[in-house]
From Swiss-Prot:
Keyword match Chloroplast: yes
One of the record's GO cellular component terms: chloroplast
Pfam families (UniProt xref): Intron_maturas2, MatK_N
Protein name (record): Maturase K
PANTHER family in the record: MATURASE K
Membership in a protein family: Belongs to the intron maturase 2 family. MatK subfamily.
Length: 507
């Protein structure tokens, strides 16, 4: 039990007590704007945060002056008539303050992240940020495992849970009051996390703010996994301990310590599995194991009860699905992944005797589901729900080359993300939809027919929809007898993809 108490030890020297005064500093808002340009700790591009050119120094000074004059905003949560966010710029001022607040709240987390990387001597690498790096890991590990659990991270049932989560790391009462104010404002505008909304549906104008809250909440829920994994295995754990310093977690788990004081090691023995692997992206996580179905049920039961009893989160058991890898498709990051048993017959000739040997190899396959992807393309108005291409409205001053480049860029981005698919028929279907949609858009602009327009452009139009990997593969396999066959089956994982394309994110 000493190990558990040491793991939950409070590190008071790293708590941040005076963050709220930073909200009145101009450089914080400049920093928020620069982070939007260069990417924040969560590696999101500027356009996702809703920033525009309005963030001038004059507006920032005007906002800070107003906050100085009405500093009681943090105390007026229950009084909707008292707020600094009034007038025709209410939404913009509110967005600016929430963005600045999010940058301030990121400070302790970024410091701990840097400290953790230095302690573990982990080199900063952009490749490690790629979400495509998950699939080579799957390909190497999942083919040797038996069961997989699809886990949906539980949502908070009350706004105060989010506040208390940050309270575990930040001892700054004014900042916490301001956080409550923001949450109540967003609750009134129906922009908060709900069981029916995923992180991709957060308010585009304040995504940094929600990412901060969501990540802190998720890491709090995952803490039990990290602890049990470290205690139940002698193998080296690569899980990050950056977000595991909490001030109130010990109090929440005190009852568990008393109950399991005598049987703690026996309880940990139930979770021993040297072949356990855990991966998460956004609100979905995967727990894969070589163990039995009974072991996976024990993990499921423990997680559900722990979330319910010690984090005050209602997590329904049906949010964790246990399946065998051999007869189940795993839907993750826009791919349908599975492990298939490939059987082949090998003939062996030894002097006068010949043998036929059956060999079976587990093969990891990744497919792109056609129906959800067509649904995403239809939602973007490139086709109807049946997959028939339609024309899009464009600006009258848009040139033909700009329109063609735009459609070609969309397809190349989609193909780039789904380049790891074992079969490319889905991508060929999407290419057909985007090409014909582009042709119909141009024909509509010039008041012509699609046939006449394609005849005029010829092969130049088709080359815009050639992807980089298709061009590279054509050079690599140009001496083979069937380059199209090889490129059709080739899987490529890229290490420069740090987020899901909006069209690819059809979850």
């Amino acid at each position: 039990m000493e190990e558990l108490q040491g793991y939950l030890e409070i590190d008071r020297s790293r708590q941040q007590h005076f963050l709220y005064p930073l909200l009145f500093q101009e450089y914080i808002y400049a920093l928020a704007h620069d982070h939007g340009l260069n990417g924040s700790i969560f590696y999101e591009p500027m356009e996702n945060f809703g920033y525009d050119n309005k963030s001038s120094s004059l507006i920032v000074k005007r906002l800070i002056t107003r906050m100085h004059q009405q500093n009681h905003v943090i105390l007026s949560v229950n009084d909707s008539n008292e707020s600094i966010f009034v007038g025709h710029n209410k939404n913009f001022y509110f967005q600016m303050v929430s963005e600045g607040f999010a940058v301030i709240m990121e400070i302790p987390f970024s410091l701990r992240l840097v400290s953790s990387l230095e302690e573990k001597e982990i080199a900063k690498s952009h490749n490690s940020r790629s979400i495509h790096s998950i699939f080579p890991f799957f390909e190497d590990k999942l083919s040797h495992l038996n069961h997989v659990s699809d886990i949906l991270i539980p949502h908070p049932i009350h706004l105060e849970i989010l506040v208390q989560t940050l309270h575990c790391w930040i001892q700054d009462a004014p900042s916490l009051h301001l956080l409550r104010f923001f949450l109540h404002e967003y609750r009134n505008s129906n922009s908060l996390i709900t069981p029916k909304k995923s992180i991709s549906l957060f308010s585009k104008e304040n995504q940094r703010f929600f990412l901060l809250l969501y990540n802190s909440h998720v890491y709090e829920c995952e803490s039990v996994l990290v602890f049990l994994r470290k205690q139940s295995s002698h193998l080296r754990s690569t899980s990050s301990g950056t977000f595991l310093e909490r001030t109130h977690f010990y109090g929440k788990i005190e009852h568990l310590v008393v109950v399991l004081r005598n049987d703690f090691q026996k309880t940990l023995w139930l979770f021993k599995d040297p072949f356990m692997h855990y991966v998460r992206y956004q609100g979905k996580s995967i727990l894969a194991s070589k163990g039995t179905h009974l072991l996976m049920k024990k993990w499921k039961s423990h997680l559900v009860h722990f979330w319910q009893c010690h984090f005050y989160l209602w997590s329904l058991p049906d949010r964790i699905h246990i399946n065998q890898l051999y007869n189940h498709f795993l839907y993750f990051l826009g791919y349908l992944s599975s492990v298939r048993l490939n059987t082949s017959v090998v003939g062996i000739q030894m002097l006068e005797n010949s043998f036929l040997i059956d060999t079976s190899i587990n093969k990891f396959e990744t497919l792109v589901p056609i129906i959800p992807l067509i649904g995403s393309v239809a939602k973007a108005k490139f086709c109807n729900v049946s997959g028939h291409p339609i024309s899009k409205s464009v600006r009258a001053d848009s040139s033909d080359s700009d329109i063609i480049n735009r459609f070609g860029r969309i397809y190349r981005n989609l193909s780039h993300y789904h380049s790891g698919s074992s079969k490319k028929q889905t991508l060929y279907r999407i290419k057909y939809i985007l090409r014909l949609s582009c042709a119909r858009t141009l024909a509509r602009k010039h008041k012509s027919t699609v046939r006449a327009f394609l005849k005029r452009l010829g092969s130049e139009f088709l080359e815009e929809f050639l992807t980089e990997e298709e061009q590279v593969l054509s050079l690599i396999f140009q001496r083979t007898s069937s380059p199209s066959y090889r490129s059709h089956r080739e899987r490529i994982w890229y290490l420069d993809i740090i987020r899901i394309n909006d069209l690819a994110n059809h979850s």
